[in-house]
């Protein structure tokens, strides 16, 4: 662990406890949670955050929406004049999702542009033979220009280690000079830990939808801090992933993207986990998967390959998680000629060209504090690839070009 990251975690009261909550903090949290529950019951029915785009695929994109009270919701797909072309529900086993606060709508895409809004009505009664509704609300109309897997160019933005500094999302997104951001990757540690659904809405979903997420799909890469807290096991349901896995791969534009889930930084048997984790076997599972996807036809059809993973396994620390990530993934990547591995975690930005240790570029983003924040821009057109590590003020740190 780097000196700066150590100081940051110490200042947050997280060092040495693996982000576990001290006894006093726990009782305070429980008091607040109880207070939140009573508040939620009395608050008005509304969007908890604006709709947000997930899981961009060749034939569809997922629109997620979250509300303050249980409801029945749907997506209206619109034409250029705002006329409803199609109404889309979340359907499973013949039932339209209802009487819940969170929805995922799989929306077919026939081209690059999609215009939509989300509509919902509060459920006031959901009895076996009688369902009643209350107030109906709708979001603003949003127009998203979506990338296609077979298009010749793509531009993507990668952020990391926001650690609940909510204003950083808009600041870094707007500072980026990319004309279009086809995808945004949040490369881990958006949180200190996750205790309630309100953590997700207030610390992530509200700021990212205010900035970009209703029109630019984002990929939530799990960092080691997202694994912590009593809501960590519910975390994934608020996002959408191929095959419902944090680790996944896809081709978008000329780039084949591989997203790894680096897991925790400490050994599985560490006391802070209380016997509840098994990241070593999970990383071995990913290794077997990684060996297959790197040989896939989809990967071979791409001109570039970029790996996004939170914990860097080069130019980092000697903690167990770092070393086990290296043991699982480095040789596989080394033998399959990837272009770059992009990470965060250390809270110290760094750039490393291929050398005797690794034949791919290693980029590590900075930390959450003002003056140490960074963003990474990835641009590709045909056989040309450009990746830049940039300070929050727009000053380039370093980058590389290919083709």
Predicted regions and their residues:
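Acidic, histidine-bearing metal-coordination/catalytic regions of metal-dependent phosphoesterases
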Residues: 2-158, 163, 178, 389-403
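Short acidic, glycine-rich surface-loop motifs adjacent to enzyme active sites
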Residues: 297-317
């Amino acid at each position: 662990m780097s000196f700066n990251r150590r100081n940051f975690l110490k200042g947050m009261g997280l060092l040495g406890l693996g982000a576990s909550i001290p006894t006093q903090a726990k009782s305070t949290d429980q008091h607040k949670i109880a207070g939140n529950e009573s508040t939620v019951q009395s608050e008005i029915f509304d969007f908890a955050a604006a709709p947000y785009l997930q899981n961009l695929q060749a034939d569809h994109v997922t629109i997620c929406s979250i509300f303050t009270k249980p409801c029945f919701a749907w997506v209206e797909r619109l034409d250029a004049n705002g006329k409803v072309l199609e109404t889309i529900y979340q359907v499973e086993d013949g039932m339209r999702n209802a009487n819940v606060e969170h929805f995922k709508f799989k929306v077919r895409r026939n081209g690059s542009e999609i215009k939509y809004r989300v509509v919902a009505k509060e459920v006031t009664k959901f009895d076996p033979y009688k369902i009643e509704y209350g107030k109906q609300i709708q979001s603003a109309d949003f127009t998203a220009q979506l990338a296609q897997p077979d298009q010749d160019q793509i531009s993507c933005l990668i952020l990391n280690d926001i650690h609940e500094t909510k204003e950083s999302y808009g600041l870094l997104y707007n500072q980026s000079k990319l004309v279009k951001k086809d995808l945004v990757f949040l490369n881990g540690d958006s949180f200190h830990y996750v205790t309630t659904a309100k953590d997700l809405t207030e610390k992530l979903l509200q700021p990212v939808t205010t900035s970009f997420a209703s029109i630019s799909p984002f990929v939530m890469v799990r960092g080691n801090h997202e694994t912590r807290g009593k809501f960590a096991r519910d975390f994934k349901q608020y996002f959408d992933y191929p095959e419902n896995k944090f680790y996944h791969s896809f081709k978008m534009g000329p780039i084949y993207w591989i997203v790894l889930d680096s897991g925790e930084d400490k050994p599985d048997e560490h006391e802070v986990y209380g016997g509840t984790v098994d990241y070593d076997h999970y990383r071995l599972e990913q290794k077997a998967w990684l060996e297959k996807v790197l040989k896939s036809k989809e990967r071979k059809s791409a001109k570039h390959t970029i790996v996004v993973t939170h914990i860097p396994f080069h130019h980092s620390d000697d903690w167990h998680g770092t070393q086990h990530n290296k043991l699982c993934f480095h040789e596989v990547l080394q033998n399959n000629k990837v272009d770059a591995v992009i990470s965060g975690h250390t809270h110290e930005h760094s750039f490393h060209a291929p050398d005797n240790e690794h034949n791919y570029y290693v980029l590590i983003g900075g930390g959450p504090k003002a003056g140490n924040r960074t963003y990474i821009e990835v641009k590709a057109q045909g056989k040309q690839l450009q990746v830049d590590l940039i300070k929050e003020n727009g000053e380039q740190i370093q980058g590389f070009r290919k083709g």
